[in-house]
Amino acid sequence: MLATLARVAALRRTCLFSGRGGGRGLWTGRPQSDMNNIKPLEGVKILDLTRVLAGPFATMNLGDLGAEVIKVERPGAGDDTRTWGPPFVGTESTYYLSVNRNKKSIAVNIKDPKGVKIIKELAAVCDVFVENYVPGKLSAMGLGYEDIDEIAPHIIYCSITGYGQTGPISQRAGYDAVASAVSGLMHITGPENGDPVRPGVAMTDLATGLYAYGAIMAGLIQKYKTGKGLFIDCNLLSSQVACLSHIAANYLIGQKEAKRWGTAHGSIVPYQAFKTKDGYIVVGAGNNQQFATVCKILDLPELIDNSKYKTNHLRVHNRKELIKILSERFEEELTSKWLYLFEGSGVPYGPINNMKNVFAEPQVLHNGLVMEMEHPTVGKISVPGPAVRYSKFKMSEARPPPLLGQHTTHILKEVLRYDDRAIGELLSAGVVDQHETH
């Protein structure tokens, strides 16, 4: 079987990188005349064994660029996030729906040797293999990098873990909040004199997903240059520590321990949220000119030439006194009044929006950040759309997140060329499962 799978993989690799087919382009079988109308990853197949957030976020972004994402799930259970609610829409959680568009779901029991065989056969005809199991878990099933590399040396194998492949805590399960704590993010998040706070969205997971997405794109370019695949080690801890940015540099270079600042900034004053008569506004003055403009808008011109506030260094040193003056002034007017006064000033500013206001924000709507699609069982749904737009292809059309096992039979037939009898036997044995839509 291994020899057969290797031959299939070699044939696919040759077709992908030779551009053979008379006027056909890289990655796709479309005529050259259509090349400006396709997404860059059309023709690329992603075998996705991830669940929860970091991995699915990475593969969703790849799917947005045209890749065919085959999502492998456990029969009868599926991705953990399918049950993470409320809220639910029909039987689907909105959490799951938020990060799984543009995918096909195949339900396979990978604890069964026949299920392992299916995964290996899929790997042989895919370009990318993504998983987020604890290190060694898939190797014990015969699906580790060495196992897949033997039959598909072209494969980009991306492993997403909590803490890395090796090391003293590499065998721990990794969840966003825990990695956020270990990495220091939670230590620097929260009110100045209060307890550490978990960020309102799972930024460690999302940052890891973006790192994995970028690494996979780099892997595809590397494969284009060399014809060979590679292994990618991506983890929550490394991703978040790398994102500590200047906070980490303050400690590593300046030996300055970090602290919590609430909405304020440790090195820039003023740069924080201010309470208004009816809400909050965030204002930032990153230089002396912007600070002078803030003072004029607040009708506090006497602060501009005050020797205690003439430079950012002095403003940081005299933070408490200055913020008290500014805060008292901001509380005298409605948020809408301040938004009107700051408009066109050149000073960065904005309201603190709840979700209702976010998705009523004209710029959010203009940027196309609400994506609508037709779900097979619940009808029209809306999810956050892609953050990036491209001039040569559109991101507006998307397939809805799949039902559990919705595409099992389709993938076995169309991708692996199984016949009806073989598929029926696998279904009867519980190796695979097919969701029937009505």
Swiss-Prot record:
Reaction(s) the record says it catalyses: glutarate + succinyl-CoA = glutaryl-CoA + succinate; 3-hydroxy-3-methylglutarate + succinyl-CoA = (3S)-3-hydroxy-3-methylglutaryl-CoA + succinate; 3-hydroxy-3-methylglutarate + glutaryl-CoA = (3S)-3-hydroxy-3-methylglutaryl-CoA + glutarate; hexanedioate + glutaryl-CoA = hexanedioyl-CoA + glutarate
Entry's localization field: Mitochondrion
N6-acetyllysine modification, residue list: K394
Name of the molecule in the record: Succinyl-CoA:glutarate CoA-transferase
Pfam families: CoA_transf_3
Record EC number: 2.8.3.-, 2.8.3.13
Activation/inhibition comment: Inhibited by valsartan and losartan carboxylate.
PANTHER family (alphabetical): SUCCINATE--HYDROXYMETHYLGLUTARATE COA-TRANSFERASE
Tissue-level expression: Highly expressed in kidney. Intermediate expression in liver, skeletal muscle and pancreas. Little to no expression detected in other tissues examined.
One annotated GO molecular function: succinate-hydroxymethylglutarate CoA-transferase activity
Function field: Coenzyme A (CoA) transferase that reversibly catalyzes the transfer of a CoA moiety from a dicarboxyl-CoA to a dicarboxylate in a metabolite recycling process. Displays preference for succinyl-CoA and glutarate-CoA as dicarboxyl-CoA donors and glutarate, succinate, adipate/hexanedioate, itaconate and 3-hydroxy-3-methylglutarate as dicarboxylate acceptors. Acts on intermediates or end products of lysine and tryptophan degradation pathway, in particular catalyzes succinyl-CoA-dependent reesterification of free glutarate into glutaryl-CoA to prevent renal excretion of glutarate.
Presequence range in chain numbering: 1-31
Main subcellular location of this protein, as a coarse class: mitochondrion
The organism's place on the tree of life at top rank: Eukaryota
Family, similarity comment: Belongs to the CoA-transferase III family.
KW Ribonucleoprotein (keyword) present: no
Enzyme class (EC, first level): transferase
Claim: Zinc-finger is one of the keywords in the record: no
Entry keyword set: Acetylation, Disease variant, Glutaricaciduria, Mitochondrion, Transferase, Transit peptide
Clinical condition linked: Glutaric aciduria 3: An autosomal recessive metabolic condition characterized by urinary excretion of abnormal quantities of glutaric acid, in the presence of normal 3-hydroxyglutarate, glutarylcarnitine and glutarylglycine urinary levels. Affected individuals show no consistent clinical phenotype and many are asymptomatic.
Taxonomic source organism: Homo sapiens (Human)
Catalytic machinery residues: D205 (nucleophile)
GO cellular component annotations of the record: mitochondrion
Higher taxonomy: Eukaryota, Metazoa, Chordata, Craniata, Vertebrata
